[in-house]
Design a protein with these regions (language model features):
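Conserved active-site-proximal phosphate/metal-binding subdomains
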Residues: 74, 78, 200-237, 242-368
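Active-site entrance/lid segments in N-terminal catalytic domains of soluble metabolic enzymes
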Residues: 1-231
Length: 368
């Protein structure tokens, strides 16, 4: 899990219970990756899975496309920032010249927030913007730390990744959301396939960044596991909707060799999820989840809120440009403890979450 939910303390608490802890390094800089992997080792022993995105080339949007996407966020910006607040820059804009940040008009209407000005600069004026990290540079920080597992989301990494990982005897896992992707993974040199069903929270691991909402081969994680176990030789790891011991047993019965759990741990005391995120996970079972591109430009499942509803028919940039475009908005929403404009990633079975320690959750899983 990435996005601030995953912390050193969170992963270490999982390791202490005898489980493999996964740390999402999606957008992390190399120095942060080294620091966090070393910090985990200092706090606990056990297997660590370092997880990365496989980014695909993306073209900078036209000025018109950027303006449309920025304008689509205006209602959310206005809901979060009062006219008095609008003269104070949001995160990321402190280094911009004053003339690049729009101010409220004389009529009191809000101009573009500072994070939008920041995106105009970075998206249109940089060939290698910071929101598109180099996988090579990220992994250069990983190899010396020797995590027990490397895993990848959004596709098969370059061949050199497998060469180095195999040389260092580090297994490589890759997410698949349908059989076609799983067969590509099997031919790549990976050691196992993570079968990510449609119930899973967070980003869908689809290889195609513009995959439609209804393109899944399977209607559930269990069905996907069954299909992949029948057609693939590699071990299959079930992910998505695995919340309790019964879910684990159901996945294993269909051919999974292991399971990967995310949402079940989100409401744990040690989780880095925001207080309002945890509150909604355990206190609003009827809120429901939705697959949306609104926050990042790629399909991701999270709790429904005002932002996901507002953005259903509005302009969205390609991934990961939209992620950068909404960064300031999400940060401002978190500072205001307002869950309606945060990316509250969660699987469709989130109502089974409990407010408890990681230790208590693992005990429940073992005793059932």
């Amino acid at each position: 899990m990435a996005g601030g939910v995953c912390t050193v303390e969170f992963v270490a608490s999982v390791l202490r219970e005898g489980l493999m802890g996964s740390f999402g390094f999606a957008y992390s800089k190399p120095e942060a990756i080294s620091t966090e992997l070393r910090a985990i080792r200092k706090q606990a022993t056990g297997p660590v899975n370092a997880n990365f995105f496989v980014f695909q080339p993306v073209q900078a949007p036209s000025a018109d496309a950027l303006r449309q996407a920025a304008d689509a966020l205006r209602p959310a910006v206005e809901a979060l920032i009062t006219p008095a607040d609008a003269t104070r820059p949001l995160a990321g804009a402190q280094d911009l010249p004053a003339e690049s940040v729009d101010r409220p008009s004389e009529e009191g209407e809000l101009g573009d927030s500072a994070h939008l000005a920041f995106i105009k600069e970075s998206v249109l004026g940089a060939s290698t913007p910071e929101f598109y990290p180099s996988l090579h540079d990220q992994l250069e920080a990983v190899w010396p730390e020797r995590p027990e597992v490397l895993s990848f989301h959004f596709g098969v990494p370059p061949h050199w990744v497998f060469e180095r990982a195999h040389a260092d005897q580090i297994p490589v896992l890759i997410s698949a959301t349908k059989l076609e992707e799983a067969l590509a993974i099997e031919a790549s040199g990976a050691c196992a396939i993570i079968a990510q069903g449609p119930e899973a929270g967070g980003h869908r691991g689809c290889f195609d960044p513009k995959a439609p909402l209804d393109r899944d081969d399977a209607s559930s994680t269990i069905e996907l596991v069954r299909v992949l176990a029948r057609h693939c030789k590699l071990p299959v790891i079930a992910a998505g909707g695995i919340m309790n011991a019964e879910d684990i047993q159901a996945a294993l019965a269909q051919g999974a060799k292991a399971v990967q759990m995310g949402t079940a741990f989100l409401a744990c005391h040690e989780s880095g999820a925001s207080p309002e995120h945890k509150r909604l996970l355990t206190g609003e079972p009827g809120r429901g989840t939705v697959l949306t591109r609104a926050f990042s430009g790629r399909l991701a499942r999270g709790l429904q809120n005002e932002f996901t509803a507002m953005m259903q028919s509005r302009a969205v940039l390609d991934f990961p440009l939209q992620n950068s475009l909404t960064a300031g908005l999400r940060q401002q929403s978190a500072r205001a403890a307002n869950p309606e404009y945060q990316s509250l990633w969660a699987g469709s079975a989130y109502a089974k979450c409990r407010s408890e320690s990681v230790s208590d959750l693992v005990l429940r899983l073992e005793q059932a």
